[in-house]
Each structure stands twice: as C-alpha cells, then as structure tokens.
C-alpha cells in the first residue's frame, strides 16, 4: 500500500495547495459500496481516486478499488495502469489524484496511512486521502473526510528522523501530522431531479428510531479500542523510560571515569609523565541510539480521536435519555388524567 502512488507523474507543477475537495456523487456511491462490502469481511477497503485539479479545488470524478492483497498473482501497478488506460478510452477523467480507505472504529490514523500518503504526496503533489467511516455512516451520519500531510510531517519523513528532538524542532505532534481538507459533494442537475422524485416516492419516516438507546455495542467498541491504544502507549513509555535510565547510567559512569582520569593526569603531571587524553575514555562509552517516537505519537493521536468520539457519543446518548425521560413523564401524566 505504501508505494502505490510512487510511479505516477505529478499532475501539476504549480501551486500544490488544495483549498477544498469536490467529490461527485457517483464517486461517493462507489466508495461507500466498496467500503461496506469489505467491512462485512472485516477487511480494509482501499482504492484509487481519479479526477483533476481546477485552480485550488481538487475534483474527484471517479474511483476504482485496489485488488485484495491476498491475490499474489495480481500486479497492482499494472492493474491500475490498465484501468486508467481503459477509462481514458471512454473519455473519463483518468488522472490519479489520491486514494481512499475505510476507517476502523472511527479511527484512521496509523503508520501505514502516514507512509502511503507520504509516497502519494511526494509523487502527486495535489493528492489527498479520503477516509470513509463505515460504522458511523451505518448509524445515519455520512462520515467522509479528506486529509493531506502537513509540510512539517513531510519534512520529518524526508529526513527520516523521528527522535524527540526532531519532533520539537519541527513542532510536530499528533494534531499536526495531517491537515483536514473540506470536502463537498456535487451532483449533476439531472441527478438532483431524480433524487427529488425518489424522495417523493419513498414512504415517510416516522422517526421512531431517533430516540433509540441501544448504544452499548458502539460504546463498547470505542472503549475496547481505547484500552488497547492506552496499553500500547504505556509500553512505548516503558521502553523510552528504560532508554533514559540507560543513558543516565552511562553518563554517570562516563563522568566518574573522566573524574578519575583527571585525578590520574594530575598525578602524572606532578611526576612529569605524559597525560592521557579524555577521548580515550569517551570512546569507551558509545552513545545509545535514540528510540523513534513516531509510533507513540500516532498512538497518542488514536487515543485522542477515540476520546473525542466517546465524549461526543455520550453527550448525544445523555440528550436522548433526558428527552426520553421527559416524554415518558408526559405520557404517564396524560394517562393519570
């Protein structure tokens, strides 16, 4: 997945800034259909986005799914080129402008996502990644978001330096790895007319599910994922603390060795003997490699996302609970009368 955009030419060499993403209804329907089909098998759905760049708007007009990774006989690069070549023959936009993937329990931030978008953005400057949340959309809230890597994140990945010092220098945190790009859905006038006619034919929704309080499974999934991420972050913290303890012990040993050498050199100087250089002692203490903090940063971002989703979900559930209680009290009062 990480190098699927690696061999495509840049679509535009001028300004690579995208102010917003405009997605056709057809492309949205194809993404939604693919993501929901793969979610039934607990697989991650991924695909390519096709379109063009107009001024500072990225227009997504079509898309197609990537072949499943389990098919070893499939050449992914050749598959993509073949699909785009055939789309070009029928006069369909065939420029590769990004990719999409489904989301797992409302959380899409991962190391694989970061690597893939880095390869796309360094080869296709205007590319975006569109994330579709299947679980939230299944509850009636269409969740479609577009992201791009920030310049700081791209620079950090180019340098290949994920140490704490690099994060501080570039001022990179989990909240500044990706920048969300506004996304709008556009339909043709004929599509809007058809949707209006279909809306009149559909039966009116009575709205009896709006106050449904059966939300235990959704909250349980978020809590389980949150606990797993917190445990991963704890393990990362333990490893980093061990590194700091080793560095502190090494510095203490080096300082004691240098102090001992200074005393010995003072004795040698008083006797007129040549002194020993400090570099001989320093060579004995090799600097410890600094552990990368990228995984911990991504895990922190996942924890933050799950916490926000839980807070939002609980506030909605509490509102439903109070409304239901008021309706129940009103019903009981009416029955008493």
UniProtKB/Swiss-Prot annotation:
One GO cellular component from the entry? Answer: eukaryotic 48S preinitiation complex
In this protein, which residues make up the domain named MPN?
A: 21-153
Query: Has keyword Protein biosynthesis?
Result: yes
Pfam families xref list? eIF3h_C (PF19445), JAB (PF01398)
InterPro entries cross-referenced by the UniProt entry: eIF3h, eIF3h_C, JAMM/MPN+_dom, JAMM_MPN+_peptidase_M67A, MPN
Q: Superkingdom of this entry's organism? A: Eukaryota
Coiled coil ranges (UniProt) are none
A single GO BP annotation from the record?
A: formation of cytoplasmic translation initiation complex
The transmembrane segments are: none
Among Gene3D superfamilies, the record links this protein to:
Cytidine Deaminase, domain 2 (3.40.140.10)
User: Which GO terms label this protein's molecular function in UniProt?
Assistant: metallopeptidase activity; translation initiation factor activity
Q: Where in the cell is it found?
A: Cytoplasm
Q: Which UniProt keywords apply?
A: Cytoplasm, Initiation factor, Protein biosynthesis
Q: What does this protein do?
A: Component of the eukaryotic translation initiation factor 3 (eIF-3) complex, which is involved in protein synthesis of a specialized repertoire of mRNAs and, together with other initiation factors, stimulates binding of mRNA and methionyl-tRNAi to the 40S ribosome. The eIF-3 complex specifically targets and initiates translation of a subset of mRNAs involved in cell proliferation.
Subunit details: Component of the eukaryotic translation initiation factor 3 (eIF-3) complex. The eIF-3 complex interacts with pix. Interacts with mxt.
Family recorded in the similarity comment: Belongs to the eIF-3 subunit H family.
Q: What is this protein called?
A: Eukaryotic translation initiation factor 3 subunit H
Organism per entry: Drosophila pseudoobscura pseudoobscura (Fruit fly)
């Amino acid at each position: 997945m990480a190098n699927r955009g690696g061999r495509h030419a840049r679509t535009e060499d001028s300004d690579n800034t995208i102010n917003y993403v405009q997605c056709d209804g057809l492309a949205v329907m194809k993404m939604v259909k693919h993501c929901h089909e793969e979610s039934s098998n607990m697989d991650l759905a991924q695909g390519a986005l096709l379109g063009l760049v107009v001024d500072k708007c990225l227009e997504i007009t079509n898309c197609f799914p990537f072949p499943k990774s389990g098919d070893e006989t499939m050449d992914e690069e050749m598959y993509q080129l073949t699909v785009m070549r055939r789309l070009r023959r029928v006069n369909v936009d065939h420029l590769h402008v990004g990719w999409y993937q489904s989301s797992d329990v409302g959380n899409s931030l991962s190391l694989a996502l970061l690597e893939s978008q880095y390869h796309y953005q360094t080869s296709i400057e205007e590319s975006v990644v569109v994330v579709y949340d299947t679980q939230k959309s299944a509850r009636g809230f269409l969740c479609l978001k577009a992201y791009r890597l920030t310049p700081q994140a791209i620079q950090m990945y180019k340098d290949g330096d994920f140490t704490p010092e690099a994060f501080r220098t570039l001022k990179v945190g989990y909240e500044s790895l990706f920048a969300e790009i506004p996304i709008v859905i556009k339909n043709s006038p004929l599509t809007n007319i058809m949707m209006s006619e279909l809306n009149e034919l559909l039966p009116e929704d009575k709205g009896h599910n709006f106050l449904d309080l059966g939300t235990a499974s959704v909250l349980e999934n978020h809590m389980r994922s949150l606990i797993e991420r917190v445990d991963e972050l704890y393990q990362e913290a333990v490893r980093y603390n061990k590194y700091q303890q080793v560095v502190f012990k090494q510095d203490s040993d080096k300082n004691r060795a240098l102090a001992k050498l200074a005393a010995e050199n003072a004795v040698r100087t008083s006797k007129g003997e040549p002194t020993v250089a400090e570099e001989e002692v320093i060579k004995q203490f090799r600097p410890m490699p600094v552990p990368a903090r990228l995984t911990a940063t991504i895990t922190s971002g996942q924890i933050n996302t799950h916490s926000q989703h839980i807070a939002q979900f609980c506030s909605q559930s509490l509102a439903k609970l109070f409304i239901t209680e008021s309706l129940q009290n009103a019903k009981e009062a009416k029955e008493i009368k």
